[in-house]
């Protein structure tokens, strides 16, 4: 009886989680930037690292900008 109870509760939880994951995946596929993610959007890319850093690839800030702020540099 306990096993049946656990299975009956577990199946809807897994299904709801799967639907949520599919929705997230679909949002990423429909992203206009082609999957280019901004991992540092609130604190680094755009405030500390500027688009001017994208044109200086030999500096440390330029290397960081081209690697992690690709949306800002137009690489995506």
Swiss-Prot record:
GO terms for cellular component: extracellular region; nematocyst. Residues 1-16 form the signal peptide. Keywords: Nematocyst, Secreted, Signal, Toxin. Transmembrane segments: none annotated. The keyword Methyltransferase does not apply. The keyword Signal applies. Its main location: secreted. It comes from the Eukaryota. Belongs to the sea anemone 8 toxin family. This is U-actitoxin-Avd8c. It comes from Anemonia viridis.
